């Protein structure tokens, strides 16, 4: 940090009086300072996080979301949770008490095509992105495979998607062997249900009622 220019201002919530800080009288362009708090929180949050709410009724597993982002995630799998859910033949997904907009405050709508702006959803799955891999035998593998993907050798982008539709177009000639591309898909409850069924390889029922008297499954991080 000795070669960096840093400015930090610390003050009480709802009060404009600064308590302390470093270089806070220097004019600077604000950056993503919340990342500092994110790192601090992750270092002090322990070794598990709540991943799903669940309730077992006879041979049926009832689940609801906590917002956990790593179900079927392309980079960070959760084998213990996935094995637990797959051990049931009957699964019911309960509507979670989560109210989200697809984009956060100040998110740019035209960044919808970038992996770092995957849509927010009540139950993220696959990281809310598709993974496109050009394998060394020149075949193209798309995960998950429930969306329509069309080759278009005329387009200038490697991957293109209509803004509000899950119609994907790829130009294989621009994708090198071994390349991996992550591209956000449009989320919805129907898409979530379809992806859950595809990943867990079983039919999943939907229940509008919130899940009550549930337990919490904690996943290791």
Question: Can you say where each PLM-predicted feature lies in the sequence?
Answer:
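A short, well-structured edge-of-sheet supersecondary motif
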Residues: 2-22
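Conserved serine DD-peptidase/penicillin-binding transpeptidase domain
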Residues: 44-221
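Glycine-/proline-rich flexible loop or hinge segments
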Residues: 18-27, 61-63, 180
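Short glycine-rich, polar/acidic loop-and-turn segments at beta strand-coil junctions
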Residues: 12-14, 32, 67
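Residue-level preference for non-acidic, small/hydrophobic
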Residues: 16, 35-42, 91, 123
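Short active-site loop at a secondary-structure junction
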Residues: 21-41, 45
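A common structural microfeature
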Residues: 5-7, 33, 60
């Amino acid at each position: 940090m000795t070669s960096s220019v840093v400015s930090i201002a610390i003050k009480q919530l709802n009060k404009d009086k600064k308590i302390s800080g470093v270089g806070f009288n220097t004019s600077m362009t604000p950056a993503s300072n919340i990342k500092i708090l994110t790192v601090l929180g992750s270092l002090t949050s322990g070794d598990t996080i709540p991943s799903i709410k669940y309730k077992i009724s006879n041979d049926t597993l009832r689940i609801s979301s906590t917002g956990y982002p790593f179900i079927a995630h392309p980079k960070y799998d959760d084998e213990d949770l996935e094995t637990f859910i797959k051990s049931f033949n009957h699964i019911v997904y309960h509507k979670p008490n989560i109210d989200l907009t697809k984009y956060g405050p100040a998110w740019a709508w035209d960044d919808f095509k970038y992996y770092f702006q995957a849509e927010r959803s009540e139950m993220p799955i696959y990281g809310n992105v598709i993974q496109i891999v050009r394998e060394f035998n020149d075949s193209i593998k798309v995960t998950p495979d429930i969306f329509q993907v069309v080759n278009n050798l005329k387009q200038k982008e490697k991957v293109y998607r209509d803004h509000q539709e899950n119609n994907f177009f790829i130009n294989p000639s621009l994708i090198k062997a071994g390349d991996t591309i992550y591209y956000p898909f449009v989320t919805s409850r129907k898409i979530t249900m379809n992806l859950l069924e595809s990943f867990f390889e079983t039919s999943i029922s939907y229940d509008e009622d919130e899940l009550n008297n549930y337990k919490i499954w904690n996943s290791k991080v």
